[in-house]
């Protein structure tokens, strides 16, 4: 097929082939997932050929059906152009720059313009999560958190007081995530609990949901899979239709994969996919708490990598993990080669390394593993967790092969840093 096909056309082919479906089998899968009758076999075969060749783009009916059949969301295959917020929005949105906001914070007056300026500042900081060095983001996040919490002691209207509590809750959640990335576990847990309390005090159920998602994340990196499920239950009870709930389903799926329950993995992935498909596309793709639909590939990749353990290298699980990893890197890298999602890309490279080991390609596996460790912006507990899987796979298949010794040494250094 033409290599110049659209990305979505290549993806349809890759998803179908990873499942070892021929085109008639793909058609039957579409029928099984459709709520309405589909045209005859000959008509659908022509459609599938035109989709995979890139000659025609599936319409509004078939795009979500194809995504559902492949266990993902429409926007993961056909991305919507989303905004990337810049610092200029601080001025454009609130009519004030940072200096003016700080000056007015020191005064006794807190009006709607100040609240809006703070909201945009918090959104900007949340949008810096994938790129800004952890130390700098912690410094700024904590500074703004102190400023906002200090304001809570002033005489405020009930609405302004509630809004400030909510903004403080979002900042606390962000700071807690960065603290955990840097392996400051006690501080991260304390900040997570502060975010939970601020969410409860402000009545912001989304913050409550994210505080529980953080609990699930912390738990899975410690190997506490039952803790993940408990956090997901609490988060879904508090914010059942939120973006946090989507990510909690993903954490559940990852936990079930590690427990070894394939059926529950599929159930959790499908529940999360269905909820994410219903939610509006994020206004800002960089926002840490937005849940970019493309991230669903990232979670599916993790699950199928785990499910592929002990299976043939050409198994559906391993082929899906490989395909998802390639999609994660492609989506997380812009046209100039700059990585928009460096932490996701690192875990995707680890996945490709694990698949390479299963295919008997040690040199390729080590190359992917080393590349994953080179990122400037890292979530050390998560990276250590998945890299450990690659290290274990290399050791199981190749023992103490000298060509892998340097990578395994680097991996031990990472594990030491992540403790």
Q: How would you label these PLM feature ranges?
A:
Residues 1-35:
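A short, Lys/Arg-rich alpha-helix, primarily the initiator
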Residues 1-4, 106-115, 119-419:
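Conserved binding/catalytic microenvironments
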Residues 30, 52, 62, 70, ...:
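DNA major-groove recognition helix of helix-turn-helix
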Residues 31-58:
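Recognition helix of helix-turn-helix/homeodomain-like DNA-binding domains
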Residues 55-76:
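DNA major-groove recognition helix of helix-turn-helix/homeodomain DNA-binding modules
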Residues 71-84, 296:
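Short C-terminal boundary/hinge segments that cap the last helix of small helical domains
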Residues 78-98:
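Short, charged recognition helix plus adjacent turn
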């Amino acid at each position: 097929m033409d290599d110049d096909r659209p990305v979505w056309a290549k993806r349809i082919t890759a998803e179908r082939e990873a499942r070892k479906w021929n085109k008639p089998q793909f058609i039957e899968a579409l029928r099984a997932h459709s709520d309405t009758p589909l045209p005859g076999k000959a008509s659908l075969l022509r459609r599938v050929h035109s989709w995979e060749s890139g000659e025609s783009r599936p319409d509004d009916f078939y795009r979500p059906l194809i995504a559902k059949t492949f266990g993902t969301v429409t926007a993961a295959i056909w991305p919507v152009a989303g905004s990337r917020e810049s610092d200029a929005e601080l001025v454009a949105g609130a009519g004030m720059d940072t200096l003016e906001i700080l000056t007015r914070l020191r005064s006794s007056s807190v009006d709607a313009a100040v609240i809006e300026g703070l909201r945009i500042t918090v959104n900007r900081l949340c949008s810096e999560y994938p790129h800004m060095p952890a130390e700098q983001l912690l410094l700024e996040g904590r500074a703004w958190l102190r400023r906002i919490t200090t304001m809570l002691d002033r005489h405020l209207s009930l609405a302004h007081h509630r809004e400030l509590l909510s903004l403080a809750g979002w900042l606390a959640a962000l700071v807690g995530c960065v603290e955990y990335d840097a392996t400051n576990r006690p501080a991260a847990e304390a900040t997570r609990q502060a975010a939970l309390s601020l969410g409860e005090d402000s009545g912001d159920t989304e913050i409550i949901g994210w505080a529980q998602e953080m609990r699930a994340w912390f738990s899975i990196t410690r190997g506490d899979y039952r803790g993940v499920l408990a956090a997901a239950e609490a988060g879904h009870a508090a914010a059942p239709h939120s973006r946090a709930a989507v990510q909690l389903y993903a954490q559940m799926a990852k936990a079930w994969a590690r427990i070894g329950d394939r059926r529950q993995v599929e159930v959790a992935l499908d529940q999360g996919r269905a909820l994410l498909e219903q939610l509006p596309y994020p206004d800002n793709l960089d926002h840490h708490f937005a849940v970019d639909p493309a991230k669903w590939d990232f979670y599916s990749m993790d699950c199928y990598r785990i499910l592929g353990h002990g299976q043939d290298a050409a198994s559906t699980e391993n082929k899906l993990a490989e395909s998802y990893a390639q999609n994660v890197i492609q989506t997380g890298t812009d046209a100039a080669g700059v990585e928009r999602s460096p932490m996701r890309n690192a875990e995707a490279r680890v996945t490709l390394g694990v698949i390479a080991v299963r295919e008997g390609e040690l040199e390729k596996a080590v190359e992917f593993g080393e590349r994953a460790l080179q990122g400037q912006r890292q979530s050390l507990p998560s990276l250590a967790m998945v890299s450990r899987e690659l290290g274990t796979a290399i050791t199981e298949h190749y023992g103490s092969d000298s060509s892998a010794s340097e990578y395994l040494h680097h991996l031990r250094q990472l594990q030491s840093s992540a403790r």
